[in-house]
């Protein structure tokens, strides 16, 4: 079976800098150029509408804004409210923030999602001060720092998504997680 990987991009539209939707659109456009993914953008404020998409997902890509060396309370609430949906699915991250580029938020999210039986992948994209690359129209101009890490992350995410989807089809994760 060689069907597309159903990838859900999760972002917060209410982040203080209002850059998450901009970055999500950029990532969605990059992913749309790749034949292996079917992509869906999901705003964390739309929790009820999210469930069908999360249930069908093979993989997740989370945008993590770093706030006080961690991630937002809204994202934490979203993760907790849809806990069962993460099981045996890979998760990748695009972190953003000040000089750290969101690396602290990503580190915390990896721990939390591993506790939810998700599989956080190693590669991530970290964007230091991404709002500095917004043009006058509010369009994010892709920095060279993002191209190679994004490609590497998507290759790994595709591999993990297919491997875990195959494993879930052979034996549902619920049967081995108890």
Residue ranges, per PLM feature:
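N-terminal beta1-alpha1 ligand-phosphate binding loop
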Residues: 2-35
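Residues at the starts of beta-strands that form the adenosine-phosphate
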Residues: 6, 38, 90
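Short hydrophobic segments within beta-strands
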Residues: 10-12, 42, 94
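Glycine-rich phosphate/pyrophosphate-binding loop and the adjoining helix
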Residues: 2-3, 8, 49-50, 54, ...
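Generic secondary-structure signature for well-ordered alpha-helical cores
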Residues: 29-36, 114, 118, 155-166
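Helix-loop-strand module that forms the ligand-binding subsite of alpha/beta enzymes
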Residues: 49-120
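A short beta-strand-loop structural module common to alpha/beta enzyme folds
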Residues: 35-46
């Amino acid at each position: 079976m060689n069907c597309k990987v159903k990838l859900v991009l999760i972002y917060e539209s209410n982040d203080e800098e209002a850059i998450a939707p901009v970055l999500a659109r950029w990532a969605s456009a990059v992913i749309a150029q790749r034949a292996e993914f079917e992509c869906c953008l999901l705003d964390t404020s739309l929790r009820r509408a999210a469930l069908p998409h999360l249930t069908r997902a093979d993989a997740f890509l989370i945008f993590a804004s770093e706030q006080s060396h961690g991630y937002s309370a809204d994202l934490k609430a979203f993760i907790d409210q849809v806990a069962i949906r993460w099981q045996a699915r890979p998760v990748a991250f695009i972190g953003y923030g000040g000089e750290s580029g969101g690396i602290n938020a990503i580190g915390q999210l990896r721990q939390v999602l591993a506790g939810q039986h998700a599989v956080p992948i190693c590669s991530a994209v970290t964007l230091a001060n991404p709002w500095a690359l917004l043009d006058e129209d509010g369009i994010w101009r892709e920095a060279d720092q993002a191209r190679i890490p994004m490609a590497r992350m998507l290759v790994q995410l595709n591999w993990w998504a297919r491997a875990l989807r195959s494993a879930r089809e052979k034996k549902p994760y619920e049967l081995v997680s108890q």
